[in-house]
A protein has these predicted regions:
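Active-site acidic catalytic loop and adjacent metal/ATP-binding pocket
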Residues: 62, 155-200
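Active-site activation/catalytic loop segments of kinase-like enzymes and analogous catalytic loops
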Residues: 197-229, 242-264, 268
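An alpha-helical support segment within catalytic cores of ATP-dependent transferases
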Residues: 127-174, 282-300
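ATP/Mg2+ or Mg2+-diphosphate-binding catalytic cores
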Residues: 249-301
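ATP-binding glycine-rich phosphate-binding loop
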Residues: 2-29, 40, 64
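ATP-binding pocket architecture of kinase catalytic cores
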Residues: 27-108
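A cross-family kinase active-site recognition segment
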Residues: 91-143
Length: 301
């Protein structure tokens, strides 16, 4: 791969190492990552937000190849070269999450309607999947029903929001998790344009299903929310997204993509039972916090 990188980007590579589908490079006293694109990356979206990202010294830059393209195709695989900044590759904390990096251009969207449409499509897809592969997912049937039910409650909650606040587009990420690191956070190929509550909601949800000390996290979250500005509408959007069980749907999609064997069914049942217990316990704590802090409707998981 070294010769391809040097050819397409006219670099003289001093050091190169490979780890987890990406190459770490030192060239001309600068650090780079050459990575395969796994998610759908739209170059037009990057060009749209590039001026916004350029105002900050932490986001990585996508380097054009010698032909002026953001994406380089090698053996039918798509890659990008990222020029790194001087941030350490540490696991993100709650306070690393920003909700105020607004997109240039005074654009206004309706993310509530977009979420409703996408979530309804996701529910429809998984109901159809369960109907068509009922035998394969036999052991997971109760989990499907449980999480689909919660998903439908989340959609109903979104539909009940009648606040008139405008959805101002900000920098967010596809799926922020408690295990995500700063390299993920500042990588523009992971960035999407969405409502300001998306990242924090997905992070909270990830903590809820993975944390061994939810009480300590709730105290940290309380301090974080006090340090940020969210409207009542933002909080309702955040709460709805916390409730929507993306972690379950993501995992089933992973099963579908990797064609995991049915023999793992009982193992998966045990996993989802444990996650459901953590989720329900975490939602109880979050309900208490949100009820004390905000005047919003609360749903019991």
């Amino acid at each position: 791969m070294k010769k391809y990188i040097e050819y397409y980007y006219s670099l003289h590579i001093n050091q190169i190492s490979f780890d987890s589908s990406r190459y770490y490079i030192l060239a001309n006293n600068e650090k780079y990552i050459f990575k395969k694109l796994n998610l759908v990356f739209v170059g037009d979206n990057y060009n749209r937000i590039k001026s916004t990202l350029g105002k900050y010294n932490c986001f990585f830059d996508i380097v054009n190849n010698k032909y002026g393209n953001l994406i380089t195709t090698i053996s039918d695989e798509q890659y990008v070269l990222l020029r790194l900044t001087n941030i350490p590759n540490e696991t993100i904390s709650l306070y690393d999450i920003k909700n105020d990096i607004y997109i240039d251009g005074n654009l206004v969207s309706n993310f509530r309607e977009e979420w409703i449409t996408k979530w309804e499509q996701k529910i429809d897809y998984f109901e159809e999947l369960l109907a068509n592969k009922k035998e394969f997912y036999n052991e997971l049937y109760p989990a499907f029903q449980y999480y689909i039910g919660i998903g439908e409650e989340s959609i109903a909650y979104l539909k009940s929001i009648n606040d008139k606040d405008a959805d101002i587009p900000v920098i967010q990420h596809h799926r922020l998790k408690v295990s995500s690191n700063l390299y993920y956070y500042y990588d523009p190929t992971n960035i999407i344009i969405d409502h300001c509550s998306r990242d924090i909601a997905e992070y909270i949800k990830s903590v809820v299903i993975n944390s061994d000390d939810i009480e300590e996290f709730i105290m940290i979250l309380d301090e974080y929310l006090n340090s940020r500005v969210f409207s009542n509408y933002d909080i309702k959007m955040m709460y709805a997204r916390i409730l929507f069980p993306t972690f379950f749907f993501d995992y089933v999609e992973e099963i579908e993509m990797s064609s995991k064997k049915r023999s793992k069914g009982k193992e998966l049942v045990h996993t989802f039972e444990n996650i459901a217990l953590c989720y329900e316990n975490g939602i109880r704590y979050l309900n208490k916090l949100f009820k004390e802090k905000y005047s919003i409707p609360i749903i019991t998981a």
